[in-house]
Amino acid sequence: MKAWLRSVNESIKPKFMPGGAQAKWFPIYDAIENFIFSSTHKTTNPIHVRDSIDIQRIMVIVWLAAFPAMFFGMYNIGNQTLDYLTLVGTANTNDWHHALINLVGYSNNSFLTKMWIGAVYFVPIYAVTFAVGILWEILFAVVRKHEINEGLFVSSILFALSCPPDLPLWQAAMGITFGIVIGKEVFGGTGKNFLNPALTGRAFLYFAYPSQLSGDKVWIAGLSDTGIIPEGFSGATPLGYAAEGGLQGLTDNFSWFDAFLGNIPGSVGETSVIAIGIAAVILLATGVASYRIILGTFLGMIVMTSILNIVGSDTNPMFQVPWYWHFVIGSFAFGLVFMATEPVSGSGTNAGRWIYGALIGVTVVLIRVINPAFPEGMMLAILFANLFAPVIDHMVVSNNIAKRKRALSYE
């Protein structure tokens, strides 16, 4: 089968090469060829390469590493939705999601039913995100006459996982459009962007359409459709409770272990620290993620949280929240593993990665605690650090050069 596919590919390849009838569509042909086959280019001369990893493999590893968070996110959507609809009933639901869910029904509280409900909400968001993103990638590749790389696989799944389950599909299209075009392509494409494309798209949605990205009605699928909030029920996330009641507000409504497992309202892929931890192991073991950034961010968060705990406040209950709660609520774990470690927009020097990570950890706590307008600060903290990454690397390199010059002057 593989040999037959290779022969078919070789027979049509001349049509897409320079001078061929379909030469203008070479980026599309090249993307399909690279997706199906491994590269045919072989190096014959001695080279200075320690690993065979390339952009294609890096992107595929990150994409696959996001699967545990994705599958748990779908389960959690189904679980939260069934719990909510048990209270309000299904008679009040009338959008297209529930028409699809009714193919299976709400009565069965099984694992597969919960996965189906989660898939009904998440898969359309991911499909629209990927389809719109690939259209923009193809357009820029054809116009600029360069290859289509696998970066969209990562940007699309991370963007979709960072969204609430009830996000309108047209907003998903708008968000990924902004992330791909403004966050990446206008700067030259993959490898030249200084902002994380997925986070750029989500930040655009957050400020352009705040009612769909924040509040108490967007984190549980179906709640925004019915608009019914039963007595004693809230769709607020742990961060929402923490902003109002501090540590007491958290412990009155959630256990730390539930937050660690991910059985809480939130964005699709951001709730389960265990699922995200699996991804962290994969990315660290393959060398895709930098342990310096992860540890730097984690330590920065602990230090800043501890300082604020000691300082305290009589008017702001967020000062009471300890570091081990900050770790399991909001998008801290997701942003730490998938967004902060993105190699293009982050620092490239070893010392710079420690500083870059610490900057993220300190900033996310300051935004969460000090700024009442943004109870979740991970997105803004990473984008803020993205802006400083080139400066950090420049300072590290300049300092190393100055050290070498001083050392030479003593010889």
Per-segment meaning from a language model:
Residues S155-P165, I182, I278-L283, F334-A340:
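Generic transmembrane alpha-helix motif of multi-pass integral membrane proteins
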Residues I125-L139, I176-K184:
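Central hydrophobic cores of alpha-helical transmembrane segments in multi-pass inner-membrane proteins
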Residues E147-I228:
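Membrane-interface helix-loop-helix junctions at boundaries between adjacent transmembrane segments
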Residues M1-F122, Y126:
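N-terminal signal-anchor module of multipass membrane proteins
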Residues I294-N350:
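A beta-strand-loop signature enriched in Asp, Gly, Thr, and Trp
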Residues A173, F194-A198, W323-S331, R353, ...:
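Loop-to-transmembrane alpha-helix initiation sites
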Residues M115-T129, D166-G175, G262-V273, F319-F332:
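Structural signature of hydrophobic alpha-helical transmembrane segments
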Residues G191-G277:
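Long hydrophobic alpha-helical segments that form multi-pass transmembrane helix bundles
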